[in-house]
Amino acid sequence: MSLFLAPIHQIMYDKIHYTDDLATALAKKDPSTARALEENFPAIEKEPLEAVIDEGNIHGWLAERVVLAEKRLAFAACALAKKDRAGLMDAVKDFGRKEAFSGSADEAFILYDRRFLNGMPCDRVHMPEEAKEGVAWRITRDVHGEYYDEAGLYDALIAAWWEGLLDGSELNYHRDGNLCTLNCQVKCNSTEW
């Protein structure tokens, strides 16, 4: 439990906003979903963290916003999946593509880790794994499934985001069970094309 604001709290606040921005972008694809999202879930504060956080309960305040952002994203995604699953995945790909990423597997993972909520940092949801090439991590527990009506929908959203993010790069995201990898589609260091 923290007694004062630290950089990790700003990182969490930024992740909360990114998740909420994705929820809002998805909801805008369907006016009734956008309306229902705002009616059923309060908006997340946009003011600077130090202006809105309860400094007497930093961890609790952030945890409440994590849950709210997760619920907002799940609501928007589940509503759109029922109406137009392909359109939902295209919208998530576009959201990832807007990052205009170019870089290494390490840089891609750092970007992903700085964007998405995967519990609180102390939860250690992503654990690094040995990789011959690129980056690998194991998902130690599902912190998103409880918010979704459809099993696996969050994982599909993340896969679509990775597809958009890595569009045009030599990197490839792959998930096999709880093991995720980022590596080259072709020999990244090769001069033979």
Q: Can you name each region flagged by the protein language model?
A:
Residues 1-132, 193:
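N-terminal accessory segment detector
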Residues 131-178:
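Short, hydrophobic/π-rich interface segment
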Residues 144-147, 188-193:
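Short, charged/polar, Gly/Pro-enriched secondary-structure boundary elements
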Residues 175-189:
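Beta-rich nucleic-acid/ligand-interaction surfaces
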